[in-house]
Amino acid sequence: MKIKSVYAYLHKLPITKPYTIAYKTITETRIVFLEIMLENGLTGIGSANPFSAVVGETPEQTLANLQSGFLDEFIGKDIRLFNSLIHSAATHFPKQPGTLAAIDIAFHDLFCKYLEIPVLDFYGRQKDNLPTSVTIGIKEIKEMQQDADDYYKLGFRILKIKTGIDADADIERVIKLSEKFSKKMLIRVDANQGYTITDLQKFIESTSHLGLELIEQPMKVGQEHFLSVLPEKDKKLLVADESLIDAKSAWKLSNKPQPFGTYNIKLMKSGGIAGAREIAVIAKNAGIDLFWGCNDESIVSITAALHAAYSCSNTKYLDLDGSFDLAKDLVEGGFELKDGYLYPNCLPGLGFQKL
């Protein structure tokens, strides 16, 4: 079955709960969508929302790339050439992971619809369900406690707390939040590159009694060597996010001494499912766990990340809450959220429907 048309467009979607991280405040998200249609009308949808501060690509650049004329080369091609089509896109857009993610996700959705199987089962299901964390931005303590209480009432049992502006204030916030919620919720921390090695050592020592599950990207990219002074038990707590972009960086970080015990894979960094699974293989061979994260994203790419995550045996953590705070989306379905756990709906492709 041959490809008939491709169509890319951008939507600005408001966030219901604006939030602050170590280097910016977020009030809306700009998401690029890509539709690829076969001659029989079957359509695959991809989406992308890359963070320029992390990968050097904006959604506007993603849209321009998708509308540049390259995708017209796919028209008339057989969808059964699925892998070679994705490889062709990866060769053409080697430094534009947002662009590649939109293409990769759309082709995965379309090809598996054509096969009439879920993407997850195309690769081989390794997991059925896992709990996701929900994120609380940098706020006053009372606001954070209220957010945590609201999330608990909604059935979530894992919090991810944004930190990284002031280590002393972060310690106070995390301790007070833990005092109230540690018996009923796990707590993860994301410093978004905000700490020095001294800050990090102080934070770890001051919160060691709290049983924090993870500490994500504590220091700036390029400063990973400073982490070598930490004992192994502390490095096992650390998650590589901005330091981990693609298979090349995964390979570099997997060399001993390993600065991180876990890799945060985001499709907006890896360039989609194919690139994410390359990272997963490297991590598995190095004995490193997987943590699947996201930006503020459509159900389209969140579902794609979920299918990729559940196809990898070393997946241990999910932080796929990126569509929860969108005021609206362009699709529905994809997965079910129940008591904080994510369940793919197992329809063909990625299982969502356009609204």
Give the residues covered by each predicted segment.
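Structured beta-strand/loop patches that form or line metal/cofactor-binding pockets in enzymes
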Residues: M1-N40, I45-A53, L326-V331
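Conserved, mostly hydrophobic/aromatic
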Residues: I3, L34, G41, I103, ...
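Flexible C-terminal active-site loop/helix
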Residues: K4-I15, I31, R277, N295-L355
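Metal- or metallocofactor-binding catalytic centers and their adjacent structured scaffolds
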Residues: S5-Y7, M37-Y114
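N-terminal small/glycine-rich loop or linker at the start of catalytic domains
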Residues: K113-G137, R173, S182, Q258
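Active-site beta->alpha loop and helix N-cap motifs at the rims of alpha/beta catalytic domains
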Residues: I136-Q146, D150, A167, I171
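Catalytic core of soluble alpha/beta enzymes
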Residues: I161, D168-T303, K328-L330
